[in-house]
Amino acid sequence: MFFSSKKCKTVSKTFRGPCVRNA
């Protein structure tokens, strides 16, 4: 996952991918 913790939080709203799974 190349998504940063900060970006994940902001992207998680529109992008529901590995970020939410990792969180």
From Swiss-Prot:
UniProt keyword annotation of Secreted present: yes
Main location: secreted
Keyword Secreted: yes
Secretion signal span: none
Tissues of expression: Distributed in the epidermal cell layer of leaves and in the subepidermal layer region of stems. Not in roots.
The organism's place on the tree of life at top rank: Eukaryota
GO cellular component: extracellular region
BP-aspect Gene Ontology terms: defense response to bacterium; defense response to fungus; killing of cells of another organism
Compartments where located: Secreted, Cell wall
Alphabetically ordered keywords of this record: Antibiotic, Antimicrobial, Cell wall, Fungicide, Plant defense, Secreted
Function text: Antimicrobial peptide. Active against Fusarium spp., Gram-positive and Gram-negative bacterial pathogens.
Annotated family: Belongs to the DEFL family. Group IV subfamily.
Protein name: Defensin D4
Origin species: Spinacia oleracea
